[in-house]
Amino acid sequence: MDLDPHAGVQVGMRVVRGMDWKWGQQDGGEGGVGTVVELGRHGSPSTPDRTVVVQWDQGTRTNYRAGYQGAHDLLLYDNAQIGIRHPNIICDCCKKHGLRGMRWKCRVCFDYDLCTQCYMHNKHDLTHAFERYETSHSRPVTLSPRQGLPRIPLRGIFQGAKVVRGPDWEWGSQDGGEGKTGRVVDIRGWDVETGRSVASVTWADGTTNVYRVGHKGKVDLRCVGEAAGGFYYKEHLPKLGKPAELQRRVSADGQPFQRGDKVKCLLDTDVLRDMQEGHGGWNPRMAEFIGQMGTVHRITDRGDVRVQFNHETRWTFHPGALTKHNSFWVGDVVRVIGDLDTVKRLQAGHGEWTDDMAPALGRVGKVVKVFGDGNLRVAVGGQRWTFSPSCLVAYRPEEDANLDVAERARENKSAASVSVAGSLSVALDKLRTQKSDPEHPGRLVVEAALGNVARALDLLRRHPEQASYHPALVVDTKNQGRTALQVAAYLGQVELVRLLLQARASMDLPDDEGNTVLHYTAMGNQPEATRVLLSAGCAVDARNGTRSTALHVAVQRGFLEVVKILCERGCDVNLPDAHADTPLHSAISAGAGASSIVEVLTEVPGIDVTATNSQGFTLLHHASLKGHVLAVRKILARARQLVDAKKEDGFTALHLAALNNHREVAQVLIREGRCDVNVRNRKLQSPLHLAVQQAHLGLVPLLVDAGCSVNTEDEEGDTALHVALQRHQLLPLVADRAGGDPGPLQLLSRLQASGLPGCTELTVGAAVACFLALEGADVSYANHRGRSPLDLATEGRVLKALQGCAQRFRERQAGGGGGVPPGPRHVLSTPNTVTNLHVSGTAGPEAAECLVCSELALLILFSPCQHRTVCEECARRMKKCIRCQVVISKKLRPDGSEVVNAIQVPGPPRQLVEELQSRYRQMEERITCPICIDSHIRLVFQCGHGACAPCGAALNACPICRQPIRDRIQIFV
């Protein structure tokens, strides 16, 4: 059973009490609504795995079971708040397009859908059975008819509710001050990102603004006067923590589709036409492709299949109209699947398995022979292996687009550059040895190639003012495909260039490759000739046959002075070439040797750092792909908001740095860019997944230390721990990972410091797995195939080491309390917090590491939250717990005695300093851009909010109040 990763528990979901509820009136009574604000995780001192923390609309905050001990205390009422949407579905009652939240489809009527609100308000025939879709990807769940079922009134923060500021309030005095009330006038979505996730509130002073009620898991409001929000059928809502199964798209022969699969449509035209109704539609031209081989390009949100037949033709098909074609032939490029256990199982009777084949897992190879039994001989990494066809998938080049493999883009451009340079060198040699009549029309080009300025001048003087049209001497006549001006410019013969310009030689005439004279000065690295041509009015942005400008050429060849001159003369630094690469893309591809050029280009005022090339890489993506640290810093300085921007496949800059082992780039993105280390791509992989997948041992500790979750799962339910044991279980740790990479040594030192015996003998996969287990990775976490890391650790020594590391983590989390793993524990975040699930008894506290000073000491117990995080010395000055932010009412030593707060230094001087510091911070906050948090506000919008000039120029709506920006006023502070 495959589970839909989008249907799992996420912060922001709106919930009501469920079938296993036993917590009295904590929710304010049956029908009360709350918001999931925190998820449990294995080993957490706050909440264990399969529990959640809920902030109820009426104010109480506590934890509940979402699969823990097999119980489900809550039901999911609405998931529009986490961005769930059915893009191509229209509610047939309220007619809203792009249905948000759960979808309810009638099983009796053809193509009839309702949104949650309409379904719960008894729209459509109550005797009809419906299907529930939690997401656009999940399998439908069949429901009984609504007729006769009890409906429960919904109460909470809805239109008309009376509210005050809530637990996540961070909006100053917008409400008029603590305790002031407001009235909810509307529940809406946050732009196009989420639905029904914010409330529009009008306060007592008449001001209106929007506040979070589920958006990003935050709740800015607390309900003091509930409003009715409709009804719900308790029996028809899904249990929170029980994700829906993934909807499988299958072909006509019952096999599930994947991107890159080879398919054919083998149906008659009439049958296909009927099937296409509601599945992409019918076009008569589709009949031309019946029986032709195509490639699955993508699966649409509705489950239809987008098939590409050639470079330009794509059609959308009903999945049942297609048949998969699984054959491979000699010459086909394939990829070996990466799951070690799966390959071992499939190889039985098909060439068998040997441990020497391990390096081929996940690699790309070519089919060199097809055996009679269907097995294939595949060349991978210089060796040949026999594989079962089930172990291979068709290679999709776009999969490697995020890998800096063999510097593909740079090699292609360098090869083209070398080709042009070589042909030009051959042409010059031919010109210099050419014996021609002195009156030959191309003689002027020969003299330019020989550098005979005097002879060229003599030829020009012989026909004054007629050189441009004299039959015996045409100044723009080509010889070997070049004009005299192009040759002179390439060789840097400035005097001859001036003479030819005086003779009205054309500056715009291209050669056979489309290069103008300015391209030739760039190819020849001739700064002075470039100046002369630009002063004479030469087109600075002329493009050749590959759509490259002279700036592209100069950048690709690394000619800094020419680049400077072109930029000074106002060339367009944003023009893309045939690959949609800008000059800065090319400079980044050139590596560290072009750092000075990167400096020059990024200082040009009009440069567009958001430019994207044909592979979907922005400049920040490209710099992260290539490991260009300087470029990353320069781009972040101009547009830090791009740090988490995603490509079409969901890859961010940090994904690319992690995938390609660019540790320093990752450090810059984390520390200077403040990127989201837990961001996930379309396959739900985090940067940690990719670093582990590629065995980049230096990046794994960096990402974990930066806060990357070790228990995040990808689309297959695999955590980083699963990946480590699947991909690199057989690779030796040091022998194969040496060569100047400090990563293995860093990771080894961390393992040795933990006291793990024999860690130097571990393989790469085992070492990474042990490190992750030490950092809290759940060794019992089951993926969608039901396999845990302990199941994948087939070797007894590795299994024992993994269990030992997990035990060390539990002991560390318990504060050295004898290694008893902590039970469910609640995060007490507000005065209204109640704890449902209590910690099992543990041994008395022993010396542990203080989270502030890192000294080993007896930790102080905070009340009411019951956290032990810091030593006595650090605890004296604390007002709030640093783990849960609850105000501390009492601080207790292990013996039960109370810690007295630090003595305040009396006297006006200290109070004055604190007051001035507070005022300074307030002033700084008022004038700092709320987007980049780096620059001062320079632009003010009509709503009163503002931003710095670079951020403000790119905005269409105010980031604070979401009002459209009609005017920008520049200020000086």
Swiss-Prot record:
- In residue numbers, the zinc fingers (ZZ-type) are 86-138
- GO process terms (BP): Notch signaling pathway; protein ubiquitination
Return one GO MF term: zinc ion binding
The answer, when asked if Transferase is one of the entry's keywords, is yes
Compartment list: Cytoplasm; Endosome
Residue ranges of domain MIB/HERC2 in the record: 1-80, 149-227
Positions bound to Zn(2+) 2 = C106, C109, H124, H128
Gene3D superfamilies per the record? 3.30.60.90, Ankyrin repeat-containing domain, SH3 Domains, Zinc/RING finger domain, C3HC4 (zinc finger)
Keywords of the record, alphabetical order, are: Actin-binding, ANK repeat, Cytoplasm, Endosome, Metal-binding, Notch signaling pathway, Phosphoprotein, Repeat, Transferase, Ubl conjugation, Ubl conjugation pathway, Zinc, Zinc-finger
Query: Which biological pathway?
Result: Protein modification; protein ubiquitination
Query: Phosphoserine: which positions carry it?
Result: S251
State what protein this is by name: E3 ubiquitin-protein ligase MIB2
Query: What lineage is on file?
Result: Eukaryota, Metazoa, Chordata, Craniata, Vertebrata
Q: Which gene encodes it?
A: Mib2
